[in-house]
Protein backbone atom coordinates (compact mmCIF):
# COMPACT_ATOMS: atom_id res chain seq x y z
CA UNK A 1 0.00 0.00 0.00
CA UNK A 2 2.52 2.63 1.08
CA UNK A 3 1.64 6.20 1.76
CA UNK A 4 2.97 8.93 3.93
CA UNK A 5 2.48 9.27 7.64
CA UNK A 6 1.55 12.79 8.64
CA UNK A 7 2.47 14.44 11.92
CA UNK A 8 -0.70 16.05 13.21
CA UNK A 9 -0.95 18.89 15.68
CA UNK A 10 -3.00 17.39 18.52
CA UNK A 11 -4.41 20.76 19.57
CA UNK A 12 -7.46 20.22 17.31
CA UNK A 13 -8.06 16.84 18.96
CA UNK A 14 -7.56 18.28 22.45
CA UNK A 15 -9.99 21.13 21.72
CA UNK A 16 -12.58 18.68 20.37
CA UNK A 17 -12.30 16.54 23.52
CA UNK A 18 -12.56 19.56 25.83
CA UNK A 19 -15.64 20.91 24.04
CA UNK A 20 -17.34 17.54 23.60
CA UNK A 21 -16.85 16.24 27.17
CA UNK A 22 -19.47 18.50 28.84
CA UNK A 23 -22.26 17.40 26.46
CA UNK A 24 -21.25 13.80 25.77
CA UNK A 25 -22.64 10.73 27.51
CA UNK A 26 -19.17 9.19 27.16
CA UNK A 27 -16.89 9.62 30.21
CA UNK A 28 -13.94 11.98 29.46
CA UNK A 29 -11.27 9.25 29.70
CA UNK A 30 -13.15 7.04 27.23
CA UNK A 31 -13.76 10.03 24.97
CA UNK A 32 -10.01 10.72 24.91
CA UNK A 33 -9.34 7.07 23.98
CA UNK A 34 -11.94 7.31 21.19
CA UNK A 35 -10.23 10.37 19.74
CA UNK A 36 -6.80 8.75 20.09
CA UNK A 37 -7.96 5.74 18.07
CA UNK A 38 -9.52 7.72 15.20
CA UNK A 39 -6.36 7.48 13.09
CA UNK A 40 -7.01 3.74 12.73
CA UNK A 41 -10.14 4.55 10.71
CA UNK A 42 -7.93 6.27 8.13
CA UNK A 43 -5.47 3.36 7.75
CA UNK A 44 -4.68 3.17 4.03
CA UNK A 45 -4.61 -0.62 3.79
CA UNK A 46 -7.99 -0.94 5.52
CA UNK A 47 -9.51 1.70 3.26
CA UNK A 48 -8.15 -0.02 0.14
CA UNK A 49 -9.66 -3.32 1.29
CA UNK A 50 -12.99 -1.55 1.84
CA UNK A 51 -12.96 -0.11 -1.68
CA UNK A 52 -12.07 -3.43 -3.29
CA UNK A 53 -14.65 -5.41 -1.33
CA UNK A 54 -17.47 -2.87 -1.79
CA UNK A 55 -17.18 -1.69 -5.40
CA UNK A 56 -13.64 -2.08 -6.69
CA UNK A 57 -11.24 0.74 -7.45
CA UNK A 58 -11.79 0.26 -11.18
CA UNK A 59 -15.47 1.18 -10.79
CA UNK A 60 -14.59 4.32 -8.83
CA UNK A 61 -11.90 5.44 -11.27
CA UNK A 62 -13.45 4.37 -14.56
CA UNK A 63 -15.40 1.53 -16.13
CA UNK A 64 -15.11 -1.93 -14.57
CA UNK A 65 -15.68 -4.85 -16.97
CA UNK A 66 -18.17 -7.55 -15.96
CA UNK A 67 -19.31 -10.85 -17.43
CA UNK A 68 -23.03 -11.54 -17.28
CA UNK A 69 -24.78 -14.86 -16.70
CA UNK A 70 -24.68 -15.76 -20.40
CA UNK A 71 -21.12 -14.54 -20.86
CA UNK A 72 -22.23 -11.18 -22.17
CA UNK A 73 -19.68 -8.47 -21.47
CA UNK A 74 -20.81 -5.29 -19.74
CA UNK A 75 -19.32 -2.46 -17.75
CA UNK A 76 -20.18 -0.75 -14.48
CA UNK A 77 -19.09 2.56 -13.06
CA UNK A 78 -19.68 4.08 -9.63
CA UNK A 79 -20.77 7.71 -9.88
CA UNK A 80 -19.90 10.14 -7.11
CA UNK A 81 -22.96 10.80 -4.95
CA UNK A 82 -24.15 14.01 -3.33
CA UNK A 83 -24.99 12.93 0.22
CA UNK A 84 -26.35 14.46 3.39
CA UNK A 85 -25.08 12.47 6.36
CA UNK A 86 -27.21 12.83 9.51
CA UNK A 87 -24.72 11.74 12.14
CA UNK A 88 -25.32 10.25 15.57
CA UNK A 89 -23.47 11.89 18.43
CA UNK A 90 -22.84 8.86 20.60
CA UNK A 91 -19.18 8.42 19.54
CA UNK A 92 -16.50 10.36 17.64
CA UNK A 93 -15.98 7.22 15.56
CA UNK A 94 -19.20 8.04 13.67
CA UNK A 95 -17.67 11.23 12.26
CA UNK A 96 -14.42 9.46 11.39
CA UNK A 97 -16.16 6.59 9.59
CA UNK A 98 -18.47 8.99 7.76
CA UNK A 99 -15.56 11.10 6.53
CA UNK A 100 -13.28 8.16 5.65
CA UNK A 101 -15.93 6.22 3.77
CA UNK A 102 -17.35 9.38 2.20
CA UNK A 103 -13.91 10.25 0.86
CA UNK A 104 -13.69 6.84 -0.80
CA UNK A 105 -16.80 7.57 -2.90
CA UNK A 106 -15.33 10.82 -4.25
CA UNK A 107 -18.70 12.50 -3.79
CA UNK A 108 -19.94 15.71 -2.18
CA UNK A 109 -20.83 15.40 1.48
CA UNK A 110 -22.83 17.59 3.84
CA UNK A 111 -22.38 16.39 7.41
CA UNK A 112 -25.25 17.28 9.74
CA UNK A 113 -23.65 17.13 13.15
CA UNK A 114 -25.46 15.91 16.24
CA UNK A 115 -26.17 18.45 18.97
CA UNK A 116 -24.04 16.46 21.42
CA UNK A 117 -21.05 16.16 19.06
CA UNK A 118 -20.32 19.41 17.27
CA UNK A 119 -16.56 18.95 17.37
CA UNK A 120 -15.46 15.51 16.10
CA UNK A 121 -16.21 16.10 12.42
CA UNK A 122 -14.91 19.66 12.51
CA UNK A 123 -11.66 18.56 14.19
CA UNK A 124 -11.09 15.85 11.57
CA UNK A 125 -11.89 18.20 8.69
CA UNK A 126 -9.63 20.91 10.16
CA UNK A 127 -6.75 18.42 10.38
CA UNK A 128 -7.35 17.42 6.76
CA UNK A 129 -7.43 21.08 5.72
CA UNK A 130 -4.18 21.73 7.62
CA UNK A 131 -2.54 18.99 5.54
CA UNK A 132 -3.84 20.18 2.15
CA UNK A 133 -6.61 22.81 2.09
CA UNK A 134 -7.00 22.61 -1.70
CA UNK A 135 -7.28 18.82 -1.91
CA UNK A 136 -10.51 17.78 -3.69
CA UNK A 137 -11.50 15.49 -0.80
CA UNK A 138 -11.18 18.33 1.71
CA UNK A 139 -13.19 20.63 -0.53
CA UNK A 140 -15.96 18.03 -0.94
CA UNK A 141 -17.01 18.09 2.74
CA UNK A 142 -19.03 20.60 4.76
CA UNK A 143 -20.03 20.12 8.39
CA UNK A 144 -23.01 22.04 9.76
CA UNK A 145 -25.55 21.91 12.55
CA UNK A 146 -29.25 22.63 12.55
CA UNK A 147 -31.96 21.36 14.84
CA UNK A 148 -33.27 18.08 13.41
CA UNK A 149 -36.73 18.40 11.90
CA UNK A 150 -36.33 22.12 11.15
CA UNK A 151 -38.55 22.39 8.07
CA UNK A 152 -37.07 25.75 7.04
CA UNK A 153 -33.65 24.09 6.61
CA UNK A 154 -34.60 20.55 5.62
CA UNK A 155 -37.28 21.67 3.17
CA UNK A 156 -34.59 23.47 1.19
CA UNK A 157 -31.74 20.96 1.54
CA UNK A 158 -33.54 17.65 1.17
CA UNK A 159 -34.32 18.09 -2.53
CA UNK A 160 -33.11 15.82 -5.34
CA UNK A 161 -31.59 18.71 -7.27
CA UNK A 162 -29.16 19.28 -4.37
CA UNK A 163 -28.55 15.81 -2.88
CA UNK A 164 -29.00 12.28 -4.15
CA UNK A 165 -29.45 10.53 -0.81
CA UNK A 166 -29.73 11.09 2.91
CA UNK A 167 -27.64 8.74 5.06
CA UNK A 168 -28.73 8.49 8.70
CA UNK A 169 -26.66 7.14 11.57
CA UNK A 170 -28.53 6.49 14.80
CA UNK A 171 -31.76 5.28 16.27
CA UNK A 172 -35.42 6.04 15.66
CA UNK A 173 -35.16 9.64 16.84
CA UNK A 174 -32.40 10.42 14.33
CA UNK A 175 -34.29 8.74 11.49
CA UNK A 176 -37.47 10.72 12.15
Predicted regions located by residue number:
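N-terminal Rossmann-like NAD(P)+-binding subdomain of aldehyde/semialdehyde dehydrogenases
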Residues: 1-75
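Rossmann-like NAD(P) dinucleotide-binding subdomain of oxidoreductase/dehydrogenase enzymes
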Residues: 62-176
Amino acid sequence: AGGTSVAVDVSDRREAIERTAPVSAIPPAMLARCFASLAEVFDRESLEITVESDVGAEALDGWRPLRGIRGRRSFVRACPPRLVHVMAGNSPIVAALTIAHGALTKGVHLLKMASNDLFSATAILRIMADIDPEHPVVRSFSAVYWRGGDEAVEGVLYRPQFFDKIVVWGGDKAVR
